[in-house]
Amino acid sequence: MSTKLILSFSLCLMVLSCSAQLLPWQKGQRSRPHHGHQQFQHQCDIQRLTASEPSRRVRSEAGVTEIWDHDTPEFRCAGFVAVRVVIQPGGLLLPSYSNAPYITFVEQGRGVQGVVVPGCPETFQSGSEFEYPRSQRDQRSRQSESGESSRGDQRSRQSESEESSRGDQRSRQSESEEFSRGDQHQKIFRIRDGDVIPSPAGVVQWTHNNGDNDLISITLYDANSFQNQLDENVRNFFLAGQSKQSREDRRSQRQTREEGSDRQSRESQDDEALLEANILSGFEDEILQEIFRNVDQETISKLRGENDQRGFIVQARDLKLRVPEEYEEELQRERGDRKRGGSGRSNGLEQAFCNLKFRQNVNRPSRADVFNPRAGRINTVDSNNLPILEFIQLSAQHVVLYKNAILGPRWNLNAHSALYVTRGEGRVQVVGDEGRSVFDDNVQRGQILVVPQGFAVVLKAGREGLEWVELKNDDNAITSPIAGKTSVLRAIPVEVLANSYDISTKEAFRLKNGRQEVEVFRPFQSRDEKERERFSIV
């Protein structure tokens, strides 16, 4: 009886432990700390918005990292940090993790993305086998023989030495078997332009450009997220590499910051936190040698990034990755689900997180959520079609407007948004809570415009059209249009509109039903333009 009680108690503890590990990934309303979004609300008294481009560029061996000035009122209000990364062909963005969740949009190019989630199994295996290094095997064999010859004069420790030798032999045999099986690792997948790639805080990701053109991506960090347990600054922790600046240069910059203005000091400090150093560089050689057995001093030095001036985007050499096609990924995921369902066993974390997709493309017209053949389309990625977004409370929307087409006016009910223009140019107007314009200007490719929650925005494309991606800090961000078939005015009775605007019921009816389109509107056309269009179609 006592044995059964002990077993039951142990099982309960194990279940509680697994649940505790999953809590950090659950939605933020239940675990948002006191220093989250509420702390920075006083910074949202915005009088003017700006469409901005990157203010700082950090060069590496095989690419460039561009950082927006996130010390502006709108960036601090939203808690956003924006970074654009350009990886040259053959370049590798080194593995790193962040203290804040983020969402990445691939603007241009193709490549390979790797994701490492703590606690998840290594389900990928390379197709090629490795040959166990002959030199190491021969050297260890000679060391073993030398040890055996010397044990004749040390009979008192013979049994301990034999046991150690057997342990070394088993270790060498196990290592040799691992080499013969090939390399095992966590998931990797192909990425291309239009892909949205999310990442929770603390999850390691890396990117390789295996294409022929530059791989360009824009990343938005949510510094105010419940997953960020530090302050409002975003920090990247790299597992390899080193900044191109020497430690002496960084010390000199710190001293300059102390003597400079507060604003410049904050900007430099924030940028340095994003791209400063390899986290392994702070550990002593002796500790690393004890942890990573069977590696020489040169490898330890390279782990710490000593004398490494390549930066955090390096030129990869002989990097050949066996990447599954998309249909193979889906098949593998389905097989895993059936296997777990049939066995009835699961470790909880695997079902909840390890098998979630880390990619969704928003540049496919066939999957548009809103489509107007004469105006444009909207593709949305949220937790409904990419469930991992529920864990990080971020989402994305890709909008394509044709020539002179209009989107809006509309506002975000539950999120701030950052509009990043990917093609074309157009005019944007934003109106704040005081009923006056806080932005009225043209935007073009490469600019970001932050629109706070509740601010109404309208966009009109230019002659070449306008495309942009909106990155939002809610996994199910909701917009409310003011005009159109699904608008707020359409849902209000005619009599209420007539009294609200002091107009006749006839005018209120026209106001309410003037547009039958949904969010994306074709441009106004005169009678002559309509006739010319009809004639050209015929």
Swiss-Prot record:
UniProt region (Disordered), positions on chain: 125-194, 241-272, 326-346
UniProt xrefs under Pfam families: Cupin_1
UniProt xrefs under SUPFAM superfamilies: RmlC-like cupins
Domain Cupin type-1: from-to ranges: 49-301, 360-509
Basic and acidic residues bias spans: 131-194, 245-268, 326-340
Lineage: superkingdom: Eukaryota
Nucleus keyword on record: no
Cleaved signal peptide residues: 1-20
Record bears the keyword Cytoplasm: no
Disulfide bonds: C44-C77, C120-C354
GO molecular function: nutrient reservoir activity
Entry keywords, A to Z: Allergen, Disulfide bond, Seed storage protein, Signal, Storage protein
Job description of the protein: Seed storage protein.
Family: Belongs to the 11S seed storage protein (globulins) family.
Subunit structure comment from the entry: Hexamer; each subunit is composed of an acidic and a basic chain derived from a single precursor and linked by a disulfide bond.
Protein name: 13S globulin seed storage protein 3
Gene source species: Fagopyrum esculentum (Common buckwheat)
Source lineage: Eukaryota, Viridiplantae, Streptophyta, Embryophyta, Tracheophyta
